[in-house]
Curated annotation (Swiss-Prot):
Pfam family, one: DAO
The protein's name in its UniProt record: D-amino acid dehydrogenase
EC supergroup of this enzyme: oxidoreductase
Record-listed E.C. numbers: 1.4.99.-
Function description: Oxidative deamination of D-amino acids.
Binding site for FAD: 3-17
GO biological process terms, semicolon-separated: D-alanine catabolic process
Organism lineage string: Bacteria, Pseudomonadati, Pseudomonadota, Betaproteobacteria, Burkholderiales
Obligatory cofactor(s): FAD
Reactions catalysed: a D-alpha-amino acid + A + H2O = a 2-oxocarboxylate + AH2 + NH4(+)
InterPro entries the record matches: DadA, FAD-dep_OxRdtase, FAD/NAD-bd_sf
Amino acid sequence: MRVVVLGSGVVGVTSAYYLARAGHEVTVIDREAGPALETSFANAGQISPGYASPWAAPGVPLKAVKWMFQKHAPLAIRLDGTQFQLQWMWQMLQNCTSSRYAVNKGRMVRLAEYSRDCLQALRAETGIQYEGRTGGTLQVFRTQQQFEGAAKDIAVLREASVPYELLSPAELAQAEPALAAVSHKLTGGLRLPGDETGDCQMFTTRLAALAEQLGVKFRYNTPIDALAMAGDRIAGVKCGEELVRADSFVVALGSYSTQFLSGLVKIPVYPLKGYSITAPIVNEASAPVSTVLDETYKIAITRFDDRIRVGGMAEIVGFDKSLREARRETLELCVNDLFPGGGDTSKATFWSGLRPMTPDGTPIVGRTPVANLFLNTGHGTLGWTMSCGSGQLLADVMSGKQPAIKADDLSVHRYLGETRGAHRPAYAA
């Protein structure tokens, strides 16, 4: 089967790789000059299945109001007056109940755990290198309330059989020795030893090279204008003056998927803006050894070989990718507070990206009402964590195979009752 994958971020490239491995003839199209040059470029570097949690959680609406008046708040909202933004936020609020949180987190952990297994198998088969580490994730708490609040997440972890360790302040240094110097600031931590880290851009670039060896064709610097219909199927994708034809099409365009699919399949994927800095390590003893998640600031601090990546924030501001200096200050404050002297933040690079977020936090992977159109988008802050599993699952679905995990609640069909749009795009073949 000839398949066109639209998008060459980590989700698009993993989709292409697993489809090619399943025997399909795959072409990847992207407007950028190479793979992983947008959202996958400088993310937090975490592969954290156990921390796969929706932003829509009990208590978040009240916290959001408080965060509006805090300088270093993890969430910021700027209303733009669009119906889509307001509808998306309303849908997110509806998912902030305890029952919805449990359902959403459960399926996110299911996909993320499977994805880590797929990544480990891929690494064993190919030997792919991406400055990866397998030291686990450590979530640190600064208040007793945060420490006690971990109970609801632990319940989900137990149900999913995810190993965990609840640590006292004195025990934190067992996982991250440099935290011994600041243990007096912390009330404890939750460690997930099965989590991993790695440079997502490096992984995506090298996997694209492996995919090329399997016959995948990459077309960069190519405009992706519209899908062309022929009857009730997709005939091709309009790229400038050219119509690229195939048997099936995969939309993996991240935050741009919603607009691209407008008039065909209406999906609630909104751009959630995040930031990161990447600093060189200057003192090995004061640097992290794996990845640390600061519960107060919702910031991840991740160790690469000779760099520290610090990423976080969530801004509901549309497609604005401007770099706000106040956000850099928060990232620097967090890493310098927990790992003082570990990295030189004065020499750090500063980046922002748009994570494709659904209201329930779960990505949209699988079939659509259009027979030969498939989606792999909406992974939010967990595109790196869920990429391999999503790619393998999609390849199985498109190949007519039974996926290794429950997948019916991951497709767009869970939203069709409330967000289904028209059946035809603007362009027809």
